[in-house]
UniProtKB/Swiss-Prot annotation:
Stated name of the protein: Uncharacterized gene 19.5 protein
Organism: Enterobacteria phage T3 (Bacteriophage T3)
Designated gene of the protein: 19.5
Length: 49
């Protein structure tokens, strides 16, 4: 398993893939977090849509 991981990490395509995957997951997590923050903020201030 470790040997496979090291072999994958040596390829540039893998690094790009990991970078894109991390950025995508980070963006999705940030969006989810901001959505939850908006819900909490609006529940406190009773925002109207």
């Amino acid at each position: 398993m470790l040997r496979l991981l090291i072999a994958l990490l040596r390829h540039r395509v893998t690094w790009r893939f990991l970078l894109v995957l991390t950025a995508t997951l980070g963006y999705a997590g940030l969006n989810d977090h901001l959505g939850q923050l908006e819900v909490a903020f609006c529940s406190i201030l009773s925002c109207g849509d």
